[in-house]
Amino acid sequence: MYTYGRKSGCRMSLDYTYKGMRIAYLENDAIRVGILLDKGADVFEYTFKPRDIDFLWQSPLEMRKPYVATNAMAEGAFHDYYYGGWQEVLPSAGWASEPYMGASQGLHGEASLLPYEASALEDTPDAVSLRTRVRLSRSPLSLERTMSLQRDKAALFIKEKLVNESAEEFAIIWGHHPAIGTPFLNENCIVQTPARKVEVAAFHPNGLWEPGGDYDFPMVPNRRSGKLQNITKVLPKATRSVDVVFFKELAEGWYAITDSKSRLGFGMAWDKSVFKYLWMWQVYGGHNDYPWYGRTYNVALEPFTSYPPAGIQNAIKNGTALLMKPSEVIETDLVAVAYEAASVTRVGRDGSIAVS
């Protein structure tokens, strides 16, 4: 990344475009973060510079500027533009045909499809900070996200402010959807998180795990073998499976996914009072129909307020939907870190890593 007058320390640029779409870069000596401002302020790159590894998954669909599809999918446009990376999901997750308060919310809501305003808050060798803002179209919500780097820290710090601008109570499913892929992801990877229970969604015919719960973390019945198996151990693409699972009753809000062989990993930490659940989307080559047709190998580890990914009405029914009061403001923070270690016992919201 070119930044005039500074070639080391923290750097930031809002001067770049890709295929006509605005992008921002944040960079320090440890990591480089790319942000697609014209689509959801997605994080499309998270590269750990000492290893030249971008943890985020690239899907078979390339990053494209908006285009006219042959016809509209009932679920909406999320998959048309899903190139991988890390999206913010709001005001709902998954897809359901029924509207909420008169509006169809579509697959994973609209926050990841809208263009965001962006401005620099701080730009010094010691710290850079970018503020993004959006007001949703079909929902009475506004979202402000501030992303920051500090000198010599392999950590992206995120502060968020979500506002219900309406005079009515408004229910949401809110979460972050970072997908992890090759060249980092492989069968030497394992996920660590302080959960007590696991629930498995009835998601796809090629699911590996027995749907239901609550299973004692991390052992879950493998429905092919009939035996209990550690669900946090990443499996090879030859497994030909796809599942969505929920890690519940978290003691703290954090996870780490570590390649124990290469001693490299990626983790997140967040406020558990807001994001109470950790979802894991496991695609081990088994999503053999639309939109992946057996081509994909990835996992996503997703802090969420609620579950399952089946539209807001289902989260209301199971009592996990986040009910925002009229004019309510929610402020919270998260961090995403890269590290070199064989095993992790904790990720802190200050970007710290405790290793074993």
Predicted regions span which residues?
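Surface-exposed acidic/polar loop and edge beta-strand patches at domain peripheries
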Residues: 1-157, 168-171, 175-356
